[in-house]
Amino acid sequence: MGTKNHEAGCEHPDFEEKTASFEAVHQRILLDAKTTDGANQVRLDCPQMIKKVRTYVRSLLNGTSPMDEIMELSYIHKNGFQKIVLGRKSGFAMRLHRYLPGEGDQNVHDHRWSRLDSLVLEGSLPTNYLAYSKPNNCDAEKWERHEYCKAGDDYVVKHQGETYLAPDVCVHHSTGELYSMDAKRLHRILPATEPVATLVVTHPVPAERVWCNLYQKRIIEELEPVHEVRLTHQQMMASLKHLERLLTQQIERCATMATSKGVWA
């Protein structure tokens, strides 16, 4: 999927954003995405964006911005990572994902939203990308395809028959890397040997995209009950403090890179 970089606002890495609301972050997201259909990459690696996010996180930590909605929307995902929703507006959402060592996705899947942009803030995220294949290809494997559909406040799973997938590429997305994928990109996060944290923006879900695809080796007869474990206030504060440190480190990386470019210019 092609990406387009937007340099506006990235020229002044020393600029410190003073506005502490998620609205300031949201406006920066819209500036990069251009349109609400998620046509362009959100430059999460841009110093101005990172500083807006850090200012907002600091306001959450010092109590000047409310955390009620964040606490309500965030939980520990069954695949072994903390999913912290920092804010949502006009179809866009910004999240912090913290992966525990040794935990990974239980299935191959795609997404409902039109696009995902992700900046690795800590560790290296091993990701296995797959593609549809013909049964007679030597590296093809048979998988059971399911549609995972949202129905009101609940989800239902429908078996759609077998299909064949083959490995496309296995990538370790490293610290400081910004990567993107569209709704149809099949992937699976593999277990990491170290803690991993990513800052993620999901783009609006198309009106007709009420499902995503899940692929497993067995047929899922019915969804197992999912008990979403909510973060305690103490866990949330610890993760936000950790995020603030990671954002500061990312700003320092940007400054180092800018200095290096200046030296070699």
Regions found by a protein language model. Give the residues of each.
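A short, N-terminal "cap"/entry segment at the start of jelly-roll beta-barrel domains
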Residues: 2-93
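Catalytic micro-motifs at enzyme active sites that drive phosphoryl/nucleotidyl and oxygen chemistry
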Residues: 71-73, 104-110, 188
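Conserved short histidine dyad/triad with adjacent acidic residue
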Residues: 95-110, 129, 133, 183
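Short, conserved beta-strand element in jelly-roll/cupin
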Residues: 112-127, 131, 201
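A short hydrophobic beta-strand segment most commonly corresponding to one strand
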Residues: 117, 194-210
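Short beta-strand His + acidic residue motifs that chelate non-heme Fe in jelly-roll/DSBH
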Residues: 127-128, 181, 186-192
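Short acidic-glycine-tyrosine-enriched beta hairpin
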Residues: 131-184
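Long, compositionally biased interface segments
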Residues: 208-264
